[in-house]
From Swiss-Prot:
Residue positions, PTM Phosphothreonine: T132
Entry's localization field: Cytoplasm
Biased composition (Low complexity): 141-161, 182-202
Chain's gene name: RCN2
Other comments on record: Present with 967 molecules/cell in log phase SD medium.
Phosphoserine modifications at: S104, S110, S152, S157, S160, S183, S187, S193, S201, S255
The protein, known as: Regulator of calcineurin 2
Keyword Cytoplasm: yes
Gene Ontology cellular-component annotations: cytoplasm
Post-translational modification: Phosphorylation of Ser-152 and Ser-160 is induced 2-fold in response to mating pheromone.
Alphabetized UniProt keyword annotations: Cytoplasm, Phosphoprotein
Principal location: cytoplasm
Superkingdom of this protein's organism: Eukaryota
Span list, region Disordered: 127-213, 242-265
Amino acid sequence: MANQKQMRTQILITDIPSGKFTSKWPTQLEKTLFKEQFPNLQSHLQYYTPLPFLNRIIIIFDNEDDTLQVFKFLQELLAKENSGPMKLFVTESLLNNQHPRSRSTDDAVSLQDNNLALLEDHRNKPLLSINTDPGVTGVDSSSLNKGGSSLSPDKSSLESPTMLKLSTDSKPFSYQEPLPKLSRSSSSTSNLSLNRSSQTSLPSQLENKDKSASGTKCLFASKPLGLTIDTSTRSNAASCTENDVNATASNPPKSPSITVNEFFH
């Protein structure tokens, strides 16, 4: 099993200009390889996949000998065609670390037992982390996939950048999301300071309310006032005299009254 994982059965052609895909160059290359030069290798071919959005072609065989044979031919072919920025690699296959699509019952049971053993070994190790750098997490770097080395052997990274393109005509570039700068200690201290400030502000507000309530004085208490309307001059003079004499008294005047003597139909 270990020998199979070390087999180099994948060929990568990278940095292919976009014009090559427009002119159907990958289709012509497939015809040259498997219909003209190596028709007997068609049965050993697992994948021939052009990826225009990544500017590359992936070719995967089921054995290393056929892979190296096609790889040497591609080296000579690209040198003759003056390929320019295109690069050629032979690497381990992406399919080596994946389980087959179908297994027998015995194989499934043995696979489950192996997975349980691995889980028991790593149960006590905290692997959840925002920063996946092995220097921080303490995980063995050999057990990590270095940013898709099978797809980009010359740009392997433990931080796993993302390949982005702003438009169909622009070149792809690697983008790495920055780590958050706020630490747990700083957030806890900020929450503590907020709690302290809120606790100290509440008593001061209560004291201000008590002071404002105790310092309020009533300057005038409203009382029901009344008006008197009378048609007689004697009663008006008497009421005015009485009001002048008893100005300091708190007796309210009588309620106003209107008398209707006659009704007109």
